């Protein structure tokens, strides 16, 4: 199984990962602010359909390795917050919510969790992306963040965030054809 995101259509990407933790543990890392903040973003989630989602990203907090913020992300160096609404919530198996989105139009992220041996199969689908640029940005971001999640669940330090992100973003720039 490739760890690369797969383009499903001109507006959708899917990532599949086998994670080294139980479904319940992975669910906690998706839904509990303190755990989610170790790999993605802190913030409140009302775990019900129609519930609010707040995600506060501070990428410098995701790694013990300090490195400069790349120029395109300098405006968000001290953090950025996005808001969404939960569209589906079936603990501990499925979580979907709207995601900020460029041009004021929200996209939608869905996490599906399935037990797999002693671990969990995670399927992450990000839909309703507005452009190829959004798709490349989201693909590089999710690939990097999922790497951090996997490392955290395995009890490892994830390594430098921005260096990994730069590499994955360049990789997806070459992989994702014009939409």
Could you say what each language-model-derived stretch is?
Residues 26, 36, 53, 86, ...:
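Hydrophobic pocket/interface hotspot
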Residues 14-16, 52, 81-83, 108-110, ...:
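Well-ordered beta-strand positions in beta-sheet-rich domains
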Residues 6, 73, 77, 116-179:
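Terminal "cap-and-tail" regions of soluble proteins that handle hydrophobic small molecules
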Residues 44-45, 60-129:
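Hydrophobic-ligand binding "helix-grip"
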Residues 1-52:
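Hydrophobic ligand-binding cavity/cleft-lining segments
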Residues 33-79, 161-167:
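Short beta-edge strand/loop motif at the mouth of beta-sheet-based domains
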Residues 31-32, 91, 154:
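Residues at helix-coil transition
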């Amino acid at each position: 199984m490739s760890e690369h995101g797969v383009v499903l259509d001109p507006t959708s990407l899917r990532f599949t990962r086998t994670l080294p933790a139980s479904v319940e543990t992975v669910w906690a890392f998706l839904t509990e602010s303190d755990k989610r903040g170790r790999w993605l973003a802190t913030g409140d989630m009302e775990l019900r359909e129609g519930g609010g989602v707040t995600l506060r990203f501070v990428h410098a907090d995701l790694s013990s390795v300090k490195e400069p913020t790349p120029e395109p992300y300098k405006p968000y160096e001290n953090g950025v917050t996005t808001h969404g609404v939960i569209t589906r919530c079936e603990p501990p198996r499925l979580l979907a919510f709207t995601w900020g989105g460029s041009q004021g139009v929200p996209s939608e992220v869905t996490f599906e969790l399935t037990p797999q041996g002693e671990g969990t199969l995670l399927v992450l689908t990000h839909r309703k992306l507005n452009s190829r640029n959004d798709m490349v940005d989201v693909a590089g971001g999710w690939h990097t963040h999922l790497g951090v999640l996997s490392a955290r669940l395995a009890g490892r330090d994830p390594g430098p965030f921005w260096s990994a992100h730069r590499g994955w973003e360049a990789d997806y720039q070459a992989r994702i054809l014009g939409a």
